[in-house]
Every structure is written in C-alpha cells, then in structure tokens.
Curated annotation (Swiss-Prot):
Keyword annotations of the record: ATP-binding, Cell shape, Cell wall biogenesis/degradation, Cytoplasm, Ligase, Magnesium, Manganese, Metal-binding, Nucleotide-binding, Peptidoglycan synthesis
Residues annotated to bind Mg(2+) 1: E268, E282
Organism: Rickettsia bellii (strain RML369-C)
Pfam families in the cross-refs: Dala_Dala_lig_C (PF07478), Dala_Dala_lig_N (PF01820)
EC id: 6.3.2.4
Residues the entry annotates as binding ATP: 148-199
Metabolic or biological pathway: Cell wall biogenesis; peptidoglycan biosynthesis
Protein name: D-alanine--D-alanine ligase
Length: 321
C-alpha cells in the first residue's frame, strides 16, 4: 500500500489569479494533508470558474501562517478548497469564524464530525441510518489474527479520498500482525458489504441526484480508482428502481441536514447484492472538484454547469458567530 505523506509548511504561497472583480475571493488549497495533490487539482478548476464568473481571485497554498496572509489580503470570502486535515476537518472553518470571514462549505461541527469516521458513525446510527457492522482496533491491542471474519475493510479514523483504506478478501495473503497502522494508532474494521457503489450529490440541502460507480480495474473504489481516468465508469443517473433511488436521495438529505452541513456535499452508499439494502459509508463535506469528481458530474447532468455550481456554492458562504 502506498503511504500518502503529510508535511509541515511554515509559509503560505500566494498567487494573484485575477486582480479585478466584483468580490475578492481567497481560494485556499494545497495545505499540509495527505490529500494535498487532490486539493490543488480541485483548486485549478475552481479558480478558473471564479475568474470566468467575474471575481477577483487570490490563490493561497496554505501554510502555518495562513492567519497572517488572510489578514494581509483581506478577502470578502474564502473558498475552502482544502481536502483532509486542517481544512476538511473543521480547523480552517474554526479559524475563519474567529476572523469573521465568510467561507464556503460546512462549519466546524459538521466538518469535524464528518471527517472522524468513528464519531460520524455514531451520529448516523443515532439518526437511524443503516451502516455495516464494525469494531475499533488500537495498535496497542496487539491483534495477531483477523479481528473479524473476512472479507473486511480497514479504515483510518480521519482520512479522505480512500487514503489508507484496504479491503481484505478471503484469498489475500495478509497477516494482521504485520499491519503497521500508517495513519494513526487506531483503525475501524468494518464488515465488507458486496454490492453496488452509489454516490449522491447534495447542494444547499437538496439532493441533486445519484450515480453508480462501475469498477473497471481495481477491486474497490480506492484512491487510484477515484483519480485515474479509465479505472471506473460513472453511470449517471444511477440505474435503480424508482423506490430505491428516491430512498437514496432522501437518506442523503437526512444525513446532510441533521449534521447541519452547508454548500456542496457527497454521500456514499453501498446497495447490497441480493437484499437491496442500503448501507451508508460516509458523507464528504468538501467534495472534490477535479475533472473526474462526482458532484460536478451529477450537477452537470441536471443542468448546472461547473461555473454555476461554483457560484451556487459561493452563495452559501458564511461564518458561525
């Protein structure tokens, strides 16, 4: 398994993308998480869309001095294009609340809750959202054998883009005693549900639609599959019976609204083979905006082009008092 590294960045890099416009948008991306590369790809498209829509845009590759840089440029709005730690986990929203700068996407509670797979699972179950059975394993437990019956999924507590996720099948040459806990001292071990991978895009509390992921190469929807062209096929809209499709959208809206999310989000489900039972996997409060990303694709199918999507997200910008 490839390990995606985090790295500390002292100084934020600033680049003026457009010096004229109706409002000044600080596009914050990059940063110090393992999802840095995806964030930068998302920001490239978002930056072009903001310029096309007529905004003054300053790109900030976030470092430890982000507060100083924001104070210097004094933006009207921050477009939070960070993925992973420091941005998607509620850190940047918390800072912007203190600075009283409006920002896109969810606030501190929704962001931090969604990013932590253990606490978000508790939230889902409390709100009667169906999920696969799971347990938490700590490095100190010194587990030497499979913690549950195969097949099962290993998930880090706090990573996105399927970073660190592994699926252990019956035939795999895998010894849990050798697992090195690359993304923290605790992991979730989840029962593997064989079924159809479904994704729902939500904008401002309403589900836009759903698509199905058909794997073409890898065994599950991992980081490589998500961001490499030709590794998966997207079926939009998801070819489902009407009752299941409607339930999928309704459950997604329930998750989004009970968590008090804001702007755009993406919710992942598995539709189990044989039973047609829906299992929620997670909600992503900072969905990707890359050329292969799901939310822009679903939005486009429903008549919202990329520039309009970015403007709709921008309209929701606010800070929490």
């Amino acid at each position: 398994m490839h390990k995606y590294q985090t790295h500390w960045v002292e100084s934020s890099e600033i680049k003026i993308l457009s010096d004229k416009g109706k409002k000044h948008i600080a596009l914050v991306a990059g940063g110090m998480s393992a999802e840095r590369e995806v964030s930068l790809i998302s920001a490239e498209g978002v930056g072009k869309a903001l310029i096309e829509a007529g905004y003054k845009v300053t790109f900030i590759d976030m470092g430890a001095d982000i507060t100083v840089k924001l104070h210097e440029i004094k933006p009207d709005i921050v477009f939070n294009c960070l993925h992973g730690t420091y941005g998607e986990d509620g850190c940047l929203p918390g800072l912007l609340n203190i600075m009283r700068i409006p920002y896109t996407h969810s606030g501190v509670l929704a962001s931090s809750l969604a990013f932590d797979k253990v606490h978000s699972r508790s939230w889902f179950l409390t709100n009667n959202i169906n999920m696969a059975e799971s347990i938490v394993i700590s490095k100190g437990d010194n587990i030497k054998t499979d913690p549950i019956k195969r097949p099962y999924v290993i998930k880090p507590f706090t990573q996105g883009s399927s970073i660190g996720v592994e699926v252990i099948f019956e035939e795999d040459d895998f010894n849990f005693a050798n697992y090195d806990f690359p993304y923290g001292d605790e992991v979730i071990i989840e029962k593997y549900i064989k079924g159809r991978e479904l994704q729902v895009a939500i904008l401002n509390g309403k589900a836009l639609g759903a698509l199905e992921i058909k794997l073409l190469k890898n065994r599950f929807y991992d980081y490589e599959t998500k961001y490499t062209e030709g590794f998966a096929e997207h079926l939009c809209p998801a070819p489902l019976p009407t009752d299941i499709y409607d339930k999928l959208l309704k459950e997604s809206e329930k998750i989004y609204n009970t968590m008090n999310c804001k702007g755009a989000a993406r919710v992942e489900f598995i539709l189990e083979d044989g039973t047609n039972k829906l299992y929620a996997l997670e909600i992503n409060t900072h969905p990707g905006m890359t050329p292969l990303s799901i939310v822009p694709e679903i939005a486009a199918y429903h008549g919202i082009d990329f520039v309009n999507l970015i403007e709709e997200i921008l309209k929701t910008a606010s800070f929490e008092s």
